[in-house]
Amino acid sequence: MDEGDEDLISGRGFTEGARKAGPKPVGVLAVVGRPNVGKSSLVNRILGRRAAVVEDTPGVTRDRVSYDAEWAGTDFKLVDTGGWEADVEGIESAIASQAQVAVTLADAVVFVVDGQVGMTTTDERIVKMLRAAGKPVVLAVNKIDDQASEYLAAEFWKLGLGEPYSISAMHGRGVGDLLDVALDKLKQAEKTSGYLTPSGLRRVALVGRPNVGKSSLLNQLAREERAVVNDLAGTTRDPVDEIVNIDGEDWLFIDTAGIKRRQHKLTGAEYYSSLRTQAAIERCELALILFDASQPVSDQDLKVMSTAVDAGRAIVLVFNKWDAMDEFDKQRLERLWNTEFDRVMWAERVNLSAKTGWHTNRLTRAMDKALESWDQRIPTGKLNAFLGKIQAAHPHPLRGGKQPRILFATQASTRPPRFVIFATGFLEHGYRRYIERSLREEFGFEGTPIQISVNIREKKKRK
């Protein structure tokens, strides 16, 4: 194999989408501030492109959005929040509530103020909320476009947030230094967050749209066997991660606060719920995807499921309230299984009742099986012998008068299982599906996605 082949097997030659599927923690950096201080301009500057809407009208950022960002080799998620209105409702206004949720979800915060306007009462209100949240904060004084304006930043020492960093989001001045400090804050937060898993415990995320029974299932599984792993200092929030003992085995459940808090009742909560779900999936090894069997499967249900599959996580599909279903509803769901769930026919599936505990004892077997498959590695010799057999049984269809053939294959990695196939020509999608289906029939892989990459190599002619 040449250097390009080695890159492919190691993962360096994979597409950007495939790299993102691998497990890696992504810190969340929220950009907050009152309206028209330049938050979206700063977001665009960090991203290196015009992604956020920027106007001179206060409050233009109505939809809160997140972006994948990178600085100095560190990947993180950047959240652009709405402005804080200094109206009669103050901190309790709807938009302030949304921004407060964003801060709650973030690992660190960049607080943007306007150096040309100076310190305002709204800025001071935001500082009180940030102190209550207990998150690391970097203070950015925007619109300091030149050295002559540096003195304007000194006033913001009064906020008590430490050094004010002078920047010009429009021109890029000082933004690099600001990011260096912000990324240091993210890394420090990561050391004390749930990313640090107690030795030997598998990380589980319990995800699903609101009101499917996540909190009920967590309580049913945990009973009284709970151990707090991580508290957020200075807040009254629930613990972030919890050790839950199920049938004598300890599991680390990710972001149980996100399960128990009724965040969907807040304005804009659908967006923040989605962000929180995505963050939990990125941190976990196994996603328990909960559905309400008594309700039709929604697009949101399928989106949560696809997020976990695309992230390369082991999954178990959990259908709650199954004991309340009549035969007609059960048959309806079984029909859906062959249509809406055709992408994950390989998934482990458990039908249960979180309220009564019916069949919850079946979860641990499914969880263990899914993680065992996620960790599974097939020896190269055994893999190639098997692929040779299925290729002989069903050769690839002719393409342009030629028949692509598999020359060699190897399993490049696990978590999830990733296979690299070297072939004499392009392998059609249908044939790749045939290979995946055959691998599952022979080796199991229940509960885990499989990634297959094909590298085209001409078969060397004998001299």
Swiss-Prot record:
Q: Which residues bind GTP 2?
A: 208-215, 255-259, 320-323
- InterPro entries under this entry? AAA+_ATPase, G_ENGA, GTP-bd, GTPase_Der, KH_dom-like, KH_dom-like_a/b, P-loop_NTPase, Small_GTP-bd
Q: Name one Pfam family in it.
A: KH_dom-like
Q: Which GO terms describe its molecular function?
A: ATP hydrolysis activity; GTP binding; ribosome binding
The KH-like domain, residue ranges: 376-458
User: Gene3D superfamilies given for it?
Assistant: 3.30.300.20, P-loop containing nucleotide triphosphate hydrolases
Q: Does the keyword section mention Ion transport?
A: no
Extract the ranges annotated as region (Disordered): 1-20
SUPFAM superfamilies of this UniProt entry?
Answer: P-loop containing nucleoside triphosphate hydrolases
Q: Which GO terms describe its biological process?
A: ribosome biogenesis
Q: Where does GTP 1 bind?
A: 33-40, 80-84, 142-145
Q: Which UniProt keywords apply?
A: GTP-binding, Nucleotide-binding, Repeat, Ribosome biogenesis
Ranges of residues in domain EngA-type G:
27-190, 202-375
Q: Which family does it belong to?
A: Belongs to the TRAFAC class TrmE-Era-EngA-EngB-Septin-like GTPase superfamily. EngA (Der) GTPase family.
* Subunit organization: Associates with the 50S ribosomal subunit.
Q: Which PANTHER family match?
A: GTPASE DER (PTHR43834:SF6)
Q: What does this protein do?
A: GTPase that plays an essential role in the late steps of ribosome biogenesis.
Protein name, per record: GTPase Der
Which organism encodes this protein?
A: Bifidobacterium longum (strain NCC 2705)
Q: Which gene encodes it?
A: der
